[in-house]
A protein has these predicted regions:
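Post-HExxH zinc-binding segment in Zn-dependent metallohydrolases
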Residues: 106-141
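Second-shell loop/turn segments in exported
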Residues: 21-28, 79, 101-105
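Short pre-active-site segment immediately N-terminal to the catalytic Zn-binding motif
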Residues: 73-88
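Charge-rich, solvent-exposed alpha-helical interaction surfaces
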Residues: 32, 36-39, 92, 121, ...
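Amphipathic alpha-helical coiled-coil segments
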Residues: 145-152
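Active-site recognition of the HExxH zinc-binding catalytic motif
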Residues: 87-100
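Auxiliary, metal-adjacent structural segments of Zn-dependent hydrolase domains
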Residues: 7-70
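Sec-exported extracytoplasmic/periplasmic mature domains
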Residues: 41-45, 98, 119-126
Length: 152
């Protein structure tokens, strides 16, 4: 097999090999992100996350995904709640994955599909976590997102 026939899945695996997810920012920001990453590990999504996201960087502006850099720019408020932050990181990783796969969908549809993955993550974390506090927060976030979808 030549190097050009590896495909997106092979590129993702190659990108993941030996690569650590970088966290850049203040000590408090880094501590909060690492707390969220522990939850990503509990749910079994860490390898997936680091395959598609290479850096989580603290910024003063609006939290956003930089697809071209595979970087999440997050402000300090985005990482205050570790369960919500973990689910956001997984959602963004799915968004990057869909871009890598070349899905030709409307931007809103990509957001919606990656959002569905966020809910799947919360359900999986709720199943796998031993912490009642984490389970309650997963339940609260799922309920909140379900209610907000009903409005639209």
């Amino acid at each position: 097999m030549d190097d050009f026939s590896v495909g997106v899945e092979g590129m993702s695996r190659a990108a993941c090999r030996g690569r650590r997810l970088r966290v850049e920012g203040s000590p408090d920001f880094r501590a909060r992100v690492h707390e969220a990453l522990k939850l990503v590990r509990v749910a079994g999504y860490y390898d997936f996350l680091r395959t598609h996201i290479k850096c989580i960087r603290e910024i003063d502006g609006l939290t956003q995904l930089r697809v071209s850099e595979a970087t999440i720019w997050a402000n300090k408020y985005a990482v205050e709640n570790p369960v919500d932050a973990a689910s956001r990181f997984v959602q963004e990783a799915h968004y990057v994955q869909m871009h890598l796969e070349g899905r030709q969908l409307h931007e809103g549809m990509l957001e919606y599909l990656s959002f569905e993955k966020r809910i799947e993550f919360l359900k999986r974390l709720m199943e796998r976590s031993r912490s009642q506090e984490v389970k309650r927060e997963c339940e609260r976030l799922i309920r909140m997102w379900d209610e907000s979808l009903l409005i639209y």
